[in-house]
Amino acid sequence: MRRLAAACAVALAATVTACSSPKPAVSPNPTRYLGVAGVSMAGLRGFERVTGVRPGIVEIYTTFGDPLKSALLTAIIRGGAKPLVQLEPYHISMSAIAAGRYDAYLRRYAAGLSRLTHQVLLSFAPEANGYWYSWGCRSTSASVFVAAWRHVHDIIAHYDRRIIWLWDVNQSFPRSCAITARWPGGGYVDWVGVDGYLWYPYLTFNMVFASTIVNLRVSTGKPVLIAETGVLNMPKAAAQLKSIFAGAKAIPGVIGVVYSNYATAQHDYRLEKDPSALATFRQEARDYATR
């Protein structure tokens, strides 16, 4: 997540209850993916150059209401990667989405997706178990969130049934809300995404992610993508990167890691700022990723 990440993971409080929909099952490629988030096409080329890795997933962020970034998505596809689109409803009422007030927009968006030559991963309203977004659990009820998520899914899926639907949450932490109530249902989700960052030198992959992933795997049965992660330019950054890849390989059902190679006003996750971390990432990513 780009605004806030928690420091430690805790177990989920309850089992997620699956529900059904008319959506047919999608069979995504089971390849282990290495991805990058938050970069322009020029930034993507730079990432490939310094890491020696061609990402299998490229994650972009879009605001609900904005036109589909067709040219960017086409460029990502032509480069051999799957686009992961984070569709974020800033300043939009989730109740209004659920009630159909934005259906015309969703139909235009879906029509654009259907014209692409390759399957896209799509995440709507990520990290709803956090409190920092208007669609999060302190501002939007679980029932409204689920209704909006399903409505977005149903409108878009009518036009493009190739989409891999990613339900993306923040790693559970003491101030987060229970994930369980915001689960849209197994018929609406193909992959589960988990976001989390190793903000402090003592943190490891298992401390941040393990309990959340294990509980989501048990409760949903869906493949898990580490949809955002990163380390800061600190003395233990290289060791933390090793921890990320080792942890992702060790937990069954984790199918990929997306690294946030960008800087925010508060945090800088760019690998090129730390030669030791960059060298470690180059080696670990090559060992991890297959295409």
Feature map (PLM): residue ranges:
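C-terminal motif of bacterial Sec signal peptides marking the signal peptidase cleavage site
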Residues: 16-18
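Substrate-binding cleft of secreted/luminal carbohydrate-active enzymes
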Residues: 32, 119-126, 227-291
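N-terminal carbohydrate-binding/catalytic regions of secreted carbohydrate-active enzymes
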Residues: 33-116, 236-240, 247-251, 260, ...
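Aromatic- and acid-rich polysaccharide-binding/catalytic face
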Residues: 54-63, 179-206, 260-262
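Glycoside hydrolase catalytic-domain groove-lining segments
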Residues: 71-86, 191-235
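An active-site-proximal structural segment forming one wall of the substrate-binding cleft
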Residues: 98-121, 143-159, 181, 249
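Active-site groove signature of glycoside hydrolases
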Residues: 109-142, 163-169
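Aromatic-lined carbohydrate-recognition surfaces of secreted/lumenal glycan-active proteins
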Residues: 149, 153-177, 221-235, 259
